[in-house]
Each structure stands twice: as C-alpha cells, then as structure tokens.
Amino acid sequence: NLYLCERFGYRNCCSVMHNANGICVSVHVGEMDLYIRFWEYSCGVGHYPDWSIIIVRSNFKRNQQENLKDLARFFKEYAPRYGYKYLCTEDDDYKYYQTLGLKLIHKGFFKQYNYGLPLKELEV
C-alpha cells in the first residue's frame, strides 16, 4: 500500500492473501495489474531462496520498464527492513528478468524459467 499510495496516489487497493509460505498481493487498479508473492519460506519450490519477493505479474499500461524498475527500487530500499533478501520472477514470459538484470535460478519443464537476485546486488 505504501508504494501504491506514494507513487500513484492509490490507497487501500490491494488484496492480500495469507498462505503457509507468506503472503500474496494482488492489485488491479487504474493503470496497473500486479501479482506478487512475499515468501518467507520457499521449501525449495521453484528453487526460490527463503525470504524472496516473487514478481508473478507486473503490468503497467504506460512506461512498463520504468515502472517495473521503480517497483524494484522500492523493494530494494524497504524489503530488507522486513527480512526479505531476494527479488525473483516466476515463469517469466514477460522478460522482467531482462529489465531487472536477474539471473536464472530454475529451468523447469515447458520453458518455465524462474529468475532471481539478492536485493543488495540489484542494480536499478
């Protein structure tokens, strides 16, 4: 909510779902469609490290790459305060990993590739 309010002026517009690994956040408002997992424990699923922020979907109607980089900068600044250490993508058909400079962490069946990088190594 802090990012959405500061950057776009939206307040209380995200849906939060708790699960065994952490939380999932979904935002469908205005010019954005986001789905992000905040996993405290991955249990090896997708080869994600524990304490990962996983961008599943990040679609902005305008300035896609710049808004994605801005979101990554926000995570790099604030997420470590809450224990998160990695930024990852899931089944990255949209090529977010290229925009953010993430590295391949898992090559699954049917070209389902996951990418990730420690937040401290992220250069955005």
Regions found by a protein language model. Give the residues of each.
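Non-catalytic substrate-recognition and accessory regions of acyl/acetyltransferase enzymes
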Residues: 1-63, 73-124
